[in-house]
Amino acid sequence: MKMRVHLLAVSVLLVVLALQTTPAEADINSEMATCACQLIYRPVCASNNESYSNECVLKCASETPTGRSIGLHKVKDGNCNGEF
């Protein structure tokens, strides 16, 4: 029973995250298939005003063709919150 509830919660979270993906982020995410980052939530704000779950994920995104073309880099620790 607990496993079903947990699985349902994870499924709902994945659907919500998929619906919030922007076109530029979708390009970067589709290029990041080979990255292996730990599932640690320590958000960082990037130069594209997107929050990444941790520095490893941001580094991975910055090394994609799209990330390199836009000069993706860390701006600050924490979520972006639409600050710029």
From Swiss-Prot:
Q: Where in or outside the cell is it found?
A: Secreted
What are the recorded GO MF terms, alphabetically?
peptidase inhibitor activity; serine-type endopeptidase inhibitor activity; toxin activity
Name which cysteines form disulfide bonds.
35-60, 37-56, 45-80
Q: Name one GO cellular component term.
A: extracellular region
Q: Give TM segment ranges.
A: none
Q: Where is this site: Reactive bond?
A: 39-40
On the tree of life, the source organism's domain of life is: Eukaryota
Keyword Metal-binding included in the entry's annotation: no
Example GO biological process term?
suppression of blood coagulation in another organism
State the conditions that upregulate or repress this gene.
(Microbial infection) Up-regulated in salivary gland following infection with Plasmodium falciparum.
**Domain Kazal-like span(s) in chain numbering:** 29-82
- Glycosylation sites recorded in the entry for this protein: 49
Could you tell me the keywords of this UniProt record? Answer: Blood coagulation cascade inhibiting toxin, Disulfide bond, Glycoprotein, Hemostasis impairing toxin, Platelet aggregation inhibiting toxin, Protease inhibitor, Secreted, Serine protease inhibitor, Signal, Toxin
Signal peptide span per the entry?
1-26
Q: Record keywords: Acyltransferase included?
A: no
Recite the other comments. Reduces inflammation and neutrophil accumulation in a mouse model of acute inflammation. Prevents thrombus formation in FeCl(3)-induced carotid artery thrombosis model in mice without impairing hemostasis. Protects mice from experimental ischemic stroke by reducing local thrombus formation, blood-brain barrier damage and inflammatory responses in brain.
Assembly description: Interacts with human ELANE.
This chain's function reads: Functions as a slow and tight inhibitor of host neutrophil elastase (ELANE). Inhibits host proteinase 3 (PRTN3) and chymotrypsin. Does not inhibit other host proteases involved in coagulation or inflammation, such as cathepsin G (CTSG), trypsin, chymase, matriptase, beta-tryptase, kallikrein, urokinase-type plasminogen activator (PLAU), coagulation factors Xa (F10), XIa (F11), XIIa (F12), plasmin (PLG), thrombin (F2) and tissue-type plasminogen activator (PLAT). Inhibits host neutrophil chemotaxis induced by N-formylmethionine-leucyl-phenylalanine (fMLP) in vitro.
Q: What is this protein called?
A: Agaphelin
Q: Where does this protein come from, organism-wise?
A: Anopheles gambiae (African malaria mosquito)
